Amino acid sequence: MTTEKKENKISIKDKIFSVKQLPERTVKVPEWDGVKITIRAMNGTQRDHWDRFTAQRTLKAKANNETVIDNLGMNAKILIMTAYDSDGELMFSEDDISRLQECNGQVLDRLAQISLALSGIGVAQEASAAKNS
């Protein structure tokens, strides 16, 4: 490999890693005294964890011959992975699932839908794409 090609590959890789890749949206939550939360799209690792989490629930439902997948705690799980504070730190941890589930369900659903749309997942992503076309 020539030096020029090697430098070109390195600069391309550096360029890829230097680009802000995760879309985000700051949301004011009036139901939570107007706090602002930044919802960020899932990164690759978070997306892998999400896919595994949902696949496990799907497999469990199929194994039990259930037609409905147990979605208990899914909105809380999404927020644990995608809600950030003003310092850019994840706002919640796995320890917060139970407490999050006690919060207003409409708020959890609204924030989770934003996260799903930003992450390009499911119905939320399809609706967002339709709105932008």
Tell me the role of every PLM-derived stretch:
Residues 1-23:
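Extended acidic low-complexity intrinsically disordered regions
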Residues 23-33:
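Short acidic-hydrophobic surface loop/beta-edge motif
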Residues 2-6, 32-133:
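Short, surface-exposed, charged amphipathic helix/loop patches that serve as local interaction elements
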